[in-house]
Amino acid sequence: MTLAEFWPLCLRRLHDMLPHGQFAQWIAPLTVGEEGGVWVVYGKNQFACNMLKSQFAGKIEAVREELAAGRSAFVFKPGEGVCYEMAAVEGAVEPAEPSLHAGSEEMPVQEVLLDELPSEEPVKPAASKTAADILAERMRNLPHEPRQAAGSASRPESAAVAKARTDAQRDAEEARYEQTNLSPDYTFDTLVEGKGNRLAAAAAQAIAESPGQSYNPFFLYGSTGLGKTHLVQAVGNELLKNRPDAKVRYMHSDDYIRSFMKAVRNNTYDVFKQQYKQYDLLIIDDIQFIKGKDRTMEEFFYLYNHFHNEKKQLILTCDVLPAKIEGMDDRLKSRFSWGLTLELEPPELEMRIAILQKKAEAAGISIEDEAALFIANLIRSNVRELEGAFNRVGASSRFMNRPVIDIDLARTALQDIIAEKHKVITADIIIDAVAKYYRIKISDVLGKKRTRNIARPRQVAMSLTKELTTLSLPSIGDSFGGRDHTTVMHGIRAVAKLREEDPELAQDYEKLLILIQN
């Protein structure tokens, strides 16, 4: 098989394997070539090549071994080669249909199937596709096809007509926002997908296409700033795009509480009930704030039953699992778990970089890869802080009339954050955090035990100390019970390799970074 035959098929396979954002950002722009009989994948610079080798080389090699096993492994280098079109579906060798449980990056789907609904209220099979059907299809076919269709030729229009059309669109958007409280910026097109939100995004799109069916309610939980509001509002915007006549409302739980109390105070309770029962989709953010308010919880219990019985979609967000909401009515905690409950996790490095690049593109600013990597490594905890950091750097770029964000500009704009992170973190803090995380004693981390359950956390702690402090290798060794600097170096290298090969350890490392820095 020649390179010209292989690469279009490889693109198709990678397109089917990877989330759309990853494929579009890293794989689709690649060019390839042949040098001295060796197949070469060209990246635009060394940073891109390093990212390709660490994140995608294994997948590319797996496809090569299957389709062109006689060829040697690919080489990755900066340069420019030939750009090939992706093979059509019928031209590619169809991969085996993956299980919903396959792959370490996907959450176990048995947690979200229909049998979670209580036995006393079984779900009747629908004649049309349910959200469960759509979600299953999406999980089999992730990543999704690009949502924006290619532009087609059209007749030119006058400036006046174009302005009138734009004004009408803006007025319609403003009117829709007033009626629904949805932000037009929160759509699936503006959402960046990664490991932390991939299943939730697929489920949200399925619900937008078939609301009120299997996954009702859709309960999304996670720490602040992870993108819960964006994702749930995207469902509302997508539903209105498909069904402009749908009645949709987004609100914070505080607004619901105030609305209910006003109805009680003004004796307009019946009007209040009818107002909420009219919606086809009701989205309530931070539902945990109704806890401890007995009358509000009682009223919401009846509203919940109405939505469930009428197969109208209810979407709720929270900071914890339903069962962990202290002070919440037990009946509500039980019902919150009837449908689909998913967690949003902090964005991984690749997703953070993609978010920064998308923000830069939207702002009309160019950001160098090294600068994006620097900011993404500096801000790890949540999307909101990451976007805030970018806004600061972007403002500096505009004020200094520098159209390209490089690493020096990023360092200057974020110097107070850099100083704060390095000021408070010590080796002792890291050792304490790692010991608590792995449930071992600090004396074990500092001691001589070499069993796997002790040695691995010790190496993780050494690696974190190297990354989060300014200590030299000998100083790190001193902090870990007087170990030699070569032992520290070996531990750091071992962890770096394991983070590429072991998804569980990589996730542990990311969680520890966030815990220690926050």
UniProtKB/Swiss-Prot annotation:
Domain of life: Bacteria
InterPro entries registered for this protein in UniProt: AAA+_ATPase, Chromosome_initiator_DnaA, Chromosome_initiator_DnaA-like, Chromosome_initiator_DnaA_CS, DnaA_C, DnaA_dom, DnaA_N_dom, DnaA_N_sf
Record's compositionally biased regions (Basic and acidic residues): 164-177
Location of region: Domain I, interacts with DnaA modulators: 1-72
Swiss-Prot/TrEMBL keywords: ATP-binding, Cytoplasm, DNA replication, DNA-binding, Lipid-binding, Nucleotide-binding
GO biological process: DNA replication initiation; regulation of DNA replication
Segments for region (Domain IV, binds dsDNA): 398-518
PROSITE patterns named among the record's database cross-references: DNAA
Region annotation Disordered: where it falls in the sequence: 145-178
Localization in the cell: Cytoplasm
GO CC terms: cytoplasm; plasma membrane
Region described as Domain III, AAA+ region: 181-397
GO molecular function, one term: ATP binding
SUPFAM superfamilies given in the database record: P-loop containing nucleoside triphosphate hydrolases, TrpR-like
Binding positions for ATP per the UniProt entry: 225, 227-229
Region described as Domain II: 72-180
Subunit structure: Oligomerizes as a right-handed, spiral filament on DNA at oriC.
Family: Belongs to the DnaA family.
Domain description: Domain I is involved in oligomerization and binding regulators, domain II is flexibile and of varying length in different bacteria, domain III forms the AAA+ region, while domain IV binds dsDNA.
Function noted in UniProt: Plays an essential role in the initiation and regulation of chromosomal replication. ATP-DnaA binds to the origin of replication (oriC) to initiate formation of the DNA replication initiation complex once per cell cycle. Binds the DnaA box (a 9 base pair repeat at the origin) and separates the double-stranded (ds)DNA. Forms a right-handed helical filament on oriC DNA; dsDNA binds to the exterior of the filament while single-stranded (ss)DNA is stabiized in the filament's interior.
HAMAP family: DnaA_bact
Protein name: Chromosomal replication initiator protein DnaA
